[in-house]
Amino acid sequence: MTYFDPKIQESDFALSSYDYTLPFSAIAQNPANPRERAKLLIYQRDSGRIIHSDFYHFCDFVPKDTLLVFNDTRVIKARIYAHKLDCNTQKLSDKTFEIFYHKPLQSTSSAIPLFLVQIKGRVKCGDKLLINTDSTNPFLIAQVQECLDNGLRVVSFMQNEHALEYIQVLDMLEKYGHTPLPPYIKREDSCQDAHFYQSVFSKQLGSIAAPTASLHFSKESIESIKAQFETCFLTLHIGAGTFMNVESADIRHHLIHKEFFSLSPQSAAAIQNAHKVLCIGTTSARCVEYYARYKILQGECDIFLYPSKSFKRVDYLLTNFHLPKSTLMMLVSAMVGREKCLELYKLALEKGYRFYSYGDGMLIL
């Protein structure tokens, strides 16, 4: 069952058609604890039936002979804080600069590893930002190599005048970084976020946001799923593009972000041979659909799914409730139709469901 609403209208391509009003009180600021306490809205497309439940009963609704596909990416502690170092006086500024790590850059012209970051605060090329100001360890410095638009900067990370390699940068972020909570969570990160803003099966470090549909499962519930259904894992590293606004009034003109993905030959075979495929989250769905079209096991996924773009391999989807006018909401609309998506979101609000990353989920069958 890979169909979408066949009654495509011109309004389905209008960005404004994906807007809805969401009160701040409906945006989850903290995770459900235990994870399975999160609510679950089940929408059965064949019958039009809607059921309200929770993740304790998730397996009860998944059809037999279904393959469940999970994204095992792991979230980097991508947010770090630093102080500008005056090169003449060697004094530190009082102002704190936020550095938000994005990804490593491939460069043939640079002799040192370079990284893309976003810096809050005015900096220029050559500026040095000291990260571990209260440490007796050798100083860790981010040096600005190039200034790009939208606060983006190309930097190198240095320790004792030696440039850090990618693995060393990940180690540094793990030690000094903070959990990169999305901007709509209006609080500082805490110790609980290091645990709850990470799926229990995450392995491959590389995302700067969590695949949020995966956050609803404890180790016990994953074991229960594996005992009842076939499962497989893939990796798609979620980048900063997931938070980018769609600027085109006609969504067909939007250029979606690229994200690194990888799946094993075993997972690819399982997906290809499965009777039915249930993707846990939109990232898994995008990866599966990319593979279904191009049969590539590793690369950069830039598939954009919206009404009129049919699913070729994904039959069912588990997903959270997404931001208005977001590409994720458009992906859901590709599966159920835009008007039905808005109708389900309206119902979820009326029933007290929590939205966004730490919010509740919807199972589309």
Swiss-Prot record:
InterPro entries found in the cross-reference section: QueA (IPR003699), QueA_dom1 (IPR042118), QueA_dom2 (IPR042119), QueA_sf (IPR036100)
Annotated pathway: tRNA modification; tRNA-queuosine biosynthesis
EC number: 2.4.99.17
Domain of life: Bacteria
One Pfam family in the UniProt entry: Queuosine_synth
Molecular function as annotated in GO: S-adenosylmethionine:tRNA ribosyltransferase-isomerase activity
Coiled coil, from the record: none
GO cellular component terms given for this protein: cytoplasm
Localization (cell): Cytoplasm
Annotated keywords: Cytoplasm, Queuosine biosynthesis, S-adenosyl-L-methionine, Transferase
Reactions this protein catalyses: 7-aminomethyl-7-carbaguanosine(34) in tRNA + S-adenosyl-L-methionine = epoxyqueuosine(34) in tRNA + adenine + L-methionine + 2 H(+)
BP terms from Gene Ontology: queuosine biosynthetic process; tRNA wobble guanine modification
Subunit-structure text: Monomer.
Entry's family note: Belongs to the QueA family.
Cross-referenced PANTHER family: S-ADENOSYLMETHIONINE:TRNA RIBOSYLTRANSFERASE-ISOMERASE
Function as written in the Swiss-Prot or TrEMBL entry: Transfers and isomerizes the ribose moiety from AdoMet to the 7-aminomethyl group of 7-deazaguanine (preQ1-tRNA) to give epoxyqueuosine (oQ-tRNA).
Name of the featured protein: S-adenosylmethionine:tRNA ribosyltransferase-isomerase
Organism: Helicobacter hepaticus (strain ATCC 51449 / 3B1)
Gene name in the database record: queA
